[in-house]
A protein has these predicted regions:
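Domain-level signal for soluble alpha/beta catalytic cores
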Residues: 1-801
Length: 801
């Protein structure tokens, strides 16, 4: 078929099925790199592709899933050689049926900063190399699949968009709780990928058809009309022996439900074979894809936080240097600790979005804003409003932002619109339009509305839909232009009613120069909400203003059952005189922790600098062991418990571990200065088994275990069984952790366990990895199965203390 036919939705398009299990079944040996099949067993690889083509697959995914420089290191072949040979095999198989050939690209196998160590641009460069090779080899499209990190997916999409002109398909893998391994939601994935220009969006791997169905329904509601949706489930759920629980007939029967929800492309992933695709083809060929009716909604997001702007939404204003000497100094010094503390404090006070401004004379705004975004993403999961009119600053900040942000702002000047709107479109950002132009701010509502009309028309022409446009009719100070308040609100109402866009105001501007500013701010906020205000840029640490917002949400049925209102005020006693809560400082940051423990709270919040400062302060009054046992370990336990319950996600877990590590450095220095032995809770050896180059999960386990006080020897990835045995023998470790992500390397995990038993070493073995289950772990001889890093830490505490 022609690639353009993939998008016409006249019939279902069929993707192929599993590759790794097919290679394994046809002779791939344990430890042999699947990516080299095109060079080492080309006839076998071509035969697999041919079987899928004959089964009815319209798109054949080349065997390039792991063909990147990181995973091919030491194999003796270049990325270009492997990609070219792999696409040639798929192209040969496609000759008889006319199937399209996709350059298949999977994750790089490392977490990106801040959760890991791989820089965003380094990830981009890795993907770009593969994509250039695939385009040169004649691929028809780029297929990014099995992604779990939205940041990595963004790097891959940008690499595809900027290095070839091929269509780009994207797919993420979700766990049973409806989030990816790193905590990304279906909705955040949908709006981010579509905003970056993905031509088709889907879900693959991890689960079977029945389990993926509710997530696919959410995806269909979230992806814009015109963007096709596809699904590639596994052949059900894994059995203890590594097989899957559905046969082709059962798989096709469960898949049939997808025909009615808006999906237009179907295929299979792990465990599926040409027989599965043939049965899928028989089932879906008589059917026509149902219309997909997405919900047109205004939204902003980070991977783990999806904010739908369907009512009043609070934008924290405190990370703006105007009138804030302490923040100005922090920006000049390149000190991220203070703005990060402000971010956390605003989030806990009720902000849903954070305004971020680095516009300060005498500093490099572009570099500062870029670094500020990186630092803030490490400590908060709130979406950011990038507050700048500097195209370079916005370009750099938008590029490294993880999710869908909002840009503040453009105005009615054509020159500004021409520079900023294309950036918003490229990076999928929403945009704020200020109702002013070279003539200044019109004094009347009619004048501001006219500018708003021009901005909306220009944004639409740039490809930005109305749901991503926010108009700021501008708040003037009542002390200087008293009549301006009414004009602002009238213009706001007209924009909302007649233009069909969202609205935004900097609320606190109303009271400059007048006493008791809180009275004016709160009253104006209430008036603006009644007029249709969507985004209120304000100080969320002001109790009266947040009370007005929460009460308004109750009375307009935005806060159903008054849930949030009750949670905020159930234990509050209204007094005649109230004291205003200010943004938390290092000294105040522990107020919510047991005994007002600043170190506990700094670690819980993932604030590295504050954790170090709090540890230094605690060590002047307490013994190091007391600081560890009373503050650090309980904080890690609290974050770990949240991770288990699904209220804390992987990025926050790792940031808490990083903050704890900063505190541990202070504790170690104190112990060393005193001449005491530091000691260890116990020694643990961990490794990714022979033939497996995936070590994300293993690295996370190491970080968590180290922060609980264990001495961890990390042998790395692709580790021979003999190295593990020798390491345990030399260290005397009582616990060994083994990781495997690929089904083809699980036999090597079993071989490593058998080698440890044969050596009669006094140790227990815990295993983990995406392909493992408790039953499978038991069958290969492991003592324990650990589903995640928290489970590993719990087991270590149980066995080693």
């Amino acid at each position: 078929m022609q690639i353009r036919e993939v998008f016409d939705r006249k019939r279902f398009v069929f993707l192929d099925g599993g590759m790794g299990t097919q290679l394994q079944a046809r002779g791939l040996q344990p430890g042999q790199k699947p990516e080299l099949a095109a060079l080492e067993m080309p006839e076998v690889l071509t035969a697999i592709h041919t079987d899928y083509a004959n089964a009815g697959a319209d798109i054949l995914l080349a065997n390039t899933f792991g063909a990147n420089a990181k995973k091919l290191t030491g194999c003796g072949h270049t990325v270009e050689e492997v990609v070219s040979a792999s696409i040639a095999c798929a192209r040969k198989a496609a000759e008889t049926t006319g199937a399209c050939v996709a350059l298949d690209i999977g994750p790089l196998g490392e977490l990106l900063v801040p959760a890991g160590t791989l820089a965003f641009e380094d990830a981009y460069n890795e993907f770009a190399q593969v994509i250039r090779a695939g385009a040169a080899a004649g691929a028809d499209l780029v297929f990014l699949e099995t992604m779990t990190d939205l940041y990595e997916l963004k790097a891959a999409i940008l690499a595809a968009r900027e290095n070839c002109d091929l269509p780009v398909f994207t797919s993420m893998s979700f766990e049973s709780r409806g989030r990816t391994f790193t905590g990304c939601t279906v909705e955040s994935y949908a709006v981010t990928a579509a905003g970056l220009g993905a031509d088709a969006v889907g879900i693959n791997c991890s689960l079977g058809p029945k389990e993926i169905l509710p997530f696919a329904q959410r995806l269909c509601r979230s992806v814009p009309a015109g963007v096709p949706i596809f699904v590639k489930p596994n052949a059900g759920l894994p059995n203890p022996d590594g097989s899957y629980n559905l046969d082709p007939d059962e798989f096709a029967a469960e898949m049939k439900e997808y025909a009615a929800i808006g999906v237009s492309m179907v295929g299979g992933c792990c465990g599926t074979t040409p027989a599965f695709i043939a049965r899928l083809h028989e089932t879906f060929s008589p059917l026509t894809p149902a219309d997909k009716i997405p919900i047109r909604r205004s939204c902003l997001c980070t991977p783990v936080r999806f904010v739908e702007v369907g009512g009043i939404t609070v934008v924290g204003e405190r990370i703006n240097p105007t009138g804030k000497k302490r923040l100005q100094q922090a920006l000049r010094d390149g000190d991220s600790a203070y703005p990060c503390t402000q971010a956390v404090a605003q989030a806990e006070a009720g902000a849903q979005v954070l305004d971020v401004n680095a516009g300060l004379p005498g500093i490099d705004e572009a570099a500062t804003l870029e670094q500020l975004v990186k630092d803030l993403q490490a400590v908060t999961d709130l979406p950011l409003q990038l507050d700048s009119s500097n195209p370079e600053a916005l370009s750099r900040a938008l590029r490294i932002y993880n999710g869908k942000p909002i840009v503040n702002s453009v105005n009615g000047e054509p020159e500004t619109l021409e520079k900023i709107l294309p950036l918003c479109k490229k990076y999928g950002a929403a945009v704020v339009g200020l109702a002013l132009d070279k003539g200044g701010i019109p004094p009347t509502a009619e004048g501001r509305f006219a500018i708003a009309q021009r901005i909306v028309a220009a944004a639409n022409a740039a490809g930005i839909p109305n749901e991503d446009i926010y108009i700021d009719c501008l708040t003037l100070t009542a002390s200087a232009q008293q009549e301006g308040a009414v004009q602002t609100l009238e213009a706001l109402s007209r924009c909302k009613r007649e233009l069909g866009v969202r609205t935004v105001l900097g609320v606190s501007n109303i009271s400059f120069g007048l006493p008791c500013r809180g009275y004016l701010n709160t009253t104006f906020l209430t008036m603006a909400m009644s007029a249709g205000l969507d985004l209120a840029i304000m100080n969320p640490n002001t109790p009266e203003m947040m009370a007005a917002v929460r009460a308004y949400r109750v009375l307009t049925s935005q806060d159903l059952q008054s849930t949030d209102y009750v949670a905020a005020y159930a234990d509050v006693q209204i007094q005649t005189t109230q004291t205003s809560r200010s943004a938390a400082t290092v000294a105040e940051v522990g107020a919510a922790a047991p005994g007002g423990d600043a170190l506990f709270e700094a670690v819980r919040r993932g604030l590295k600098a504050e954790a170090r400062a709090a540890a230094d302060a605690a060590l002047t009054m307490r013994e190091p062991l007391d600081v560890v046992n009373v503050s650090l370990i309980p904080a890690l336990d609290a974050v770990g418990d949240g991770f288990e319950k699904g209220t804390v996600f992987l990025p926050q877990l790792l940031q808490a571990a990083t903050a704890a590590q900063a505190a541990f450095e202070a504790i170690k220095a104190k112990i060393a200065a005193s001449g005491q032995a530091q000691g260890s809770k116990g020694k643990i050896v961990i490794a990714t088994v022979k033939g497996d180059v995936h070590d994300i999960g293993k690295n996370i386990v190491r970080v968590i275990l180290e922060n609980y006080g264990y001495d961890v020897l990390d042998l790395g990835r692709d580790v021979d069984p003999e190295r593990v045995v020798e390491a345990v023998r030399q260290t005397g470790a009582k616990l060994v952790g083994l990781s495997a992500l690929m089904t083809t390397t699980v036999p090597n995990m079993q071989a490593t366990i058998e080698a440890l038993h044969a050596a009669h070493l006094d140790c227990k073995v815990m295993v983990g990895g995406a392909v493992l289950t408790p039953d499978y772990a038991r069958d290969i001889g492991a003592d324990y199965y650990c589903k995640d890093a928290k489970a590993s830490a719990d087991l270590a505490k149980q066995l080693l203390g």
